[in-house]
A protein has these predicted regions:
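Glycine-rich oxoanion-binding loops at beta->alpha junctions
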Residues: 6-17, 208-219, 244-279, 426-441
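Short, solvent-exposed amphipathic alpha-helical segments in soluble enzyme
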Residues: 19-21, 49, 108-111, 139, ...
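Active-site phosphate/pyrophosphate-binding segments
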Residues: 193-197, 201-229, 319-448, 458
Length: 467
């Protein structure tokens, strides 16, 4: 039996003492935890009043100490009592010295996947960690508890009543979770974009028409829609920004875009005549999942774009379109971003045909362009000499600004985020027309400004901005 976790330092500095697993005072319990225990200070003070000594600054140690506090020989009973005390998001892996052949798992608002093997069972927060060992998995739902041994796997609800779980088969190849000769995963995944695009788009275009058998959006339903609402986080939010420009142009319907983390706090105007488009690579993004549930509570129909089959967002959506990008292991998204954009266009074309809002010539032109994109991506990626040359010119710049109009603004936002994530260079993105409204005061001689001008109808004005 093994237990490990790569920890983001949300509580306490990165150090050995704050690393996982966290262990109870007696050493009986060891815990790994993904998430945040919101009431950990209150629980810590309670346990200290009971005479328990803490050695770390983590919220996770509170879980281990609570398990010890409630343990009377029944590990599952101690787990239930502990879960009833903690508030927040968690995916937990728990071992007890008294039961060395058992691993206990529990989740709330944080993904947890179980893997089925021969003479072994597995637990992970991401399915990519499992595909070296098994392709048969199931996804724990909120409030569920799992008990794993080498030979058996049981799942219970919050009252320890048995739960039957549906198995999912993961089609990803083992090689997809390996670097394949590249220095790091991001470089590999950048180079995989053309093939990911082909797998996502080509099977869905048949004889020049977009065919989305996964959807059942009737023309009458689409005509009755008052608007579309896009919800996402991070890079997926930038896809949502691009979706606004694209879908409004193709469907002639208003499109709103909101960060998932803000959706529940902005009193959204959503009804049963609103189609909510949820975008998430993992299908487990906590804020996005919470926003999805709120949208459904308000009566909206939810269509999701996700990359992981069987993920929570996919299961809870009314309709789902998968991006067949394969596992994306690098923190910074690449091929998932590209394929999400592709699916947005497929949705736009599919709905535009049903609504009759796009003339045949324009429909054919967009389809033809979509089919050419993988080849164009390959041409760009093959041009490594120029890419290296420009990188060598600009890597020392302290600040880099991205500007663009329409969809170029959305892509500029993603470019700026990528630069910050990967190079730690300060970067911001602005709508090109807003450059003169205060932003220009940040630009000095030598400041690098990256201007995106691919959107033909505005590129001329864009390029003639004052410099």
């Amino acid at each position: 039996l093994g237990l490990g976790h790569t920890r983001w330092a949300t509580h306490g500095e990165p150090s050995d003492v704050n690393s996982h697993p966290q262990v109870s005072e007696s050493g009986r319990f060891a815990v790994v935890h993904n998430g945040i225990i919101e009431n950990y200070m209150e629980l810590r003070e309670f346990l200290q009043s009971e005479g328990i000594t803490f050695v770390s600054q983590t919220d996770t140690e509170v879980v281990a100490q609570l398990l010890e506090h409630y343990y009377d020989g029944d590990i599952l009973d101690a787990v239930v009592k502990t879960l009833n005390r903690i508030q927040g998001a968690y995916a937990l892996g728990i071992v007890c010295a008294d039961c060395p052949d058992r691993l206990i798992a529990a989740r709330k608002d944080s993904p947890l996947i179980l893997g089925y093997g021969e003479g072994a069972h597995y637990l992970a927060s991401d399915v990519t960690a499992l595909i070296k060992y098994t392709r048969e998995v199931c996804y724990l739902d909120d409030g569920e508890i799992a008990e794993l041994t080498a030979d058996h796997l049981w799942v219970y609800d919050a009252y320890l009543r048995p739960v039957e779980k549906e198995r999912c088969h993961v089609d990803w190849e083992i090689s997809a979770a390996e670097k394949g000769g590249y220095e790091h995963f991001m470089a590999k995944e950048i180079m995989e974009q053309p093939e990911a695009f082909r797998k996502t788009v080509f099977p869905r275009i048949q004889e020049g028409r977009v065919v989305l058998d996964e959807l059942n959006l009737e023309p009458d339903y689409l005509r009755e829609l008052d608007k579309l609402y896009v919800i996402a986080c991070g890079s997926s939010y930038h896809v949502g920004m691009a979706a606004k420009y694209t879908l409004e142009r193709l469907l002639r319907k208003p499109v709103e875009v909101t960060l998932a983390s803000e959706f529940r706090y902005c009193d959204p105007i959503v009804t049963d005549k609103t189609l909510v488009l949820v975008i998430s690579q993992s299908g487990e993004t906590v804020d996005t999942l919470a926003a999805l549930r709120e949208a459904k509570r308000l009566g909206a129909r939810v269509l999701s774009i996700v990359n992981v089959v069987g993920s929570t967002i996919a299961r809870e959506s009314d309709d789902v379109l998968y991006t067949w990008a394969g596992p994306e292991i690098a923190v910074a998204t690449t091929k998932a971003f590209s394929t999400q954009l592709a699916v947005v266009y497929l949705i736009g074309l599919y709905c535009a045909e049903a609504l009759g809002t796009l003339d045949e010539a324009e429909y054919d032109r967009i389809v033809s362009e979509l089919l050419l994109i993988p080849t164009k991506l390959e041409q760009i990626l093959d041009n490594r000499a120029d890419i290296q040359y420009f990188a060598s010119l600009y890597f020392n710049h302290p600040s880099i600004f991205f500007i663009g109009r329409n969809i170029d603004y959305a892509i500029g936002m993603e470019g700026s985020l990528k630069l910050k994530e990967i190079s730690y260079i300060h970067s911001e993105a602005y709508a090109a027309g807003e450059l003169k409204h205060g932003t220009i005061s940040l630009i000095e001689p030598g400041t690098l400004v990256v201007a995106l001008a691919s959107y033909v109808t505005v590129s001329y004005t864009h390029l003639t901005l004052p410099t």
